[in-house]
Amino acid sequence: MIVKISWPKNNITSECFRRFGSFKRRSKSKKMSAFIEETKSLLPRIAFIACGCFSPPTPMHLRMFEIAKDHFEMQGTHRVVGGIISPTHDSYGKKGLASALDRCAMVKLATQSSNWIRLSDWEVHQNQWMRTQAVLQHHQNYINNHINSGGGGGDDGENTHLPGWLPRGLHDSRDPVHLKLLCGADLLESFAVPGLWAEADIEDIVANHGLVVITRAGSNPGKFIFDSDILTKYQSNITLITNWVPNEVSSTLIRRLLGRGQSVKYLLDDLVLEYIKRQRLFNFKSKYITDAVRPNHLLFNHAYTDNNKNANSYSIGDQLEQDMDESDTPSPQLQHTPTSRVFCCGEVPLRGSKVLRSGPGQAVQVITMQADEKEESQAKKQKISQVQL
């Protein structure tokens, strides 16, 4: 029996059939695979950017990217080429806001296992707090210029002059990449709070970029869109995606548990948790730091910057508590302590901090708060002093 497959007549499928005129000479499986891949390559390209404190970054922050990507790929309407995390500037001033340096380091560690979600530290390197609209526009402009410039014809993955957040493979096509703001329902609801957002910024974000909103099961984000004239006007640019696997672990909860000396094991990425312990962030309380020293390739580079050699140094803060940004208005600036408290590994020297270069047998100082452990502490310091600086 011969089964005929009727493909929907549109520009994408027509272009695929034109390119694959030799379909009949291919095996059925190869023919179908080639057709599917070609169809995907012709879909409009999009990328996501999430703005916020990320103090610290939680698994749910990263899950939002995966949930959004799954949605668009299952709908078959767009091809997701990248995800960007942009921590807010230090001058945002929320309680519990670790220094930009620490937040960037934690985001970098949290995204090590992802091949498409990356850190952008552009925002934290500005002279002041930036509006979300300005952050979106900067990254969109950079992507546009990169695509239009042709990038010198080389593989952009090998170009060390490009920022690390830039999605790979942008030159596979000259088609544009549309950058969308990825957020939770709380941010959508905050649009309705008087004085938190400039109406011009809301309109620009929704009209020219678009929103991808991850909502909780049982919530009604459509009501907030209906109650807003601006959101209703551009509701075709707002994608609502329900998260059917709820995760209520927030940055606020993590900071609260750490401040109480309670365990957050399995609530955070192990590397992020170890970094928090070693840097003693968020009023971390523990008698000992007992985690085993990790191999050199997993040791933290406290001087991480996003391919920016002129990046500023950031210190570790002592502040506690408060949720992620739910508005576009900063709080009064908080002062941070100008010195680091632990030795850290890396190739970039920092002012006011001691940096150990990578090498075989490298160790990280273990901090102890017990006075009767001086002997053990001295022995560890002696081992560290043997490492060539």
Curated annotation (Swiss-Prot):
Comment text on domains: The N-terminal region, which includes the putative catalytic motif, is not required for chaperone activity.
Effect recorded for residue 61 to A: Abolishes adenylyltransferase activity. Has no effect on chaperone activity
Subcellular location field: Nucleus; Cytoplasm; Presynaptic active zone
Gene Ontology molecular function: any one: ATP binding
Tissue expression per record: Abundantly expressed in neuronal and muscle cells. Present at relatively low levels at the neuromuscular junction. Expressed in the eye; present in photoreceptor cells and various neurons in the lamina cortex and medulla cortex and at low levels in the lamina.
Cellular-component GO terms for this entry: cytoplasm; mitochondrion; neuromuscular junction; neuronal cell body; presynaptic active zone
Keyword Cytoplasm recorded: yes
EC number: 2.7.7.1, 2.7.7.18
NCBIfam families for this protein: nicotinate (nicotinamide) nucleotide adenylyltransferase
Phenotype of null mutants: Larval lethal at first instar stage. Dendrites of the dorsal class IV neuron develop normally up to the first instar larval stage. Sensory neurons in the ventral nerve cord display extensive axon fragmentation and near complete loss of axon termini.
The protein, known as: Nicotinamide-nucleotide adenylyltransferase
InterPro entries xrefs: Cyt_trans-like, Euk_NMN_adenylyltrnsfrase, NadD/NMNAT, NMNAT_euk, Rossmann-like_a/b/a_fold
Top-level lineage group: Eukaryota
Segments traversing the membrane: none
Role summary: Catalyzes the formation of NAD(+) from nicotinamide mononucleotide (NMN) and ATP. Essential for viability. Stress-response chaperone protein that prevents toxic aggregation of proteins and promotes proteasome-mediated degradation of misfolded proteins; this is independent of its NAD(+) synthesis activity. Neuroprotective in response to toxic protein aggregation, for example by overexpressed Atx-1/ataxin-1. Required for maintenance and integrity of mature neurons, protecting them from neuronal activity-induced neurodegeneration.
Induction of the gene: Overall expression and the relative expression of the alternatively spliced RB mRNA (encoding isoforms B and D) is increased by heat shock (acute stress) and proteotoxic stress (chronic stress).
Source species: Drosophila melanogaster
